[in-house]
A protein has these predicted regions:
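Structural signature of nuclease core domains in nucleic-acid processing machines
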Residues: 1-142
Length: 142
């Protein structure tokens, strides 16, 4: 999907760009209530995908995602180098690891708030997602 974005698009790249890509690809008005930046005790999760009440009879999962973006310059790698690296190798890069840890900490708080609000009806899966430029995604389940 990122291949449609050009080098000039890097100028405005940030986590909002990544969230919009996910919203575009995952949006399903028939299955999910998509909630971008929902207020959770005065903090804001990036994306919550909550199964619609009338679709709860299916084994669909609810999702909570926190997005981060790190530029190629910040990881001191070229696009070609990043494309050749394994996911675990990318996750170990200091800039990526820091963002994964930050997203993880936020997700734990958001998850607790969502569970306290909705209770046992949620089948919540939580993911921190870091985009390394427009080249690769690194994710971690919480």
């Amino acid at each position: 999907y990122f291949t449609v974005l050009d080098n000039r698009d890097y100028r405005w790249a940030n986590e909002l760009t990544i969230k919009m890509v996910f919203l575009t690809l995952l949006y399903s008005e028939t299955l999910y209530i998509m909630d971008s930046e929902p207020a959770l005790q005065r903090k804001y999760a990036d994306l919550v995908m909550q199964v619609k009440p009338q679709k709860r009879q299916f084994t669909l999962q609810d999702y909570l995602m926190e997005f981060k973006y790190v530029s190629l310059a910040e990881v001191k790698r070229s696009g070609e180098q990043v494309r050749k690296m394994g996911r675990e190798e990318l996750a170990a890069l200091p800039a990526v690891a820091t963002l994964l840890d930050d997203a993880h900490a936020k997700l734990v708080g958001y998850r607790d708030t969502l569970i306290a609000t909705y209770g046992d009806i949620l089948r919540l899966r939580c993911f921190s997602v870091v985009a390394v430029g427009y080249e690769r995604l690194v994710w971690r389940a919480v």
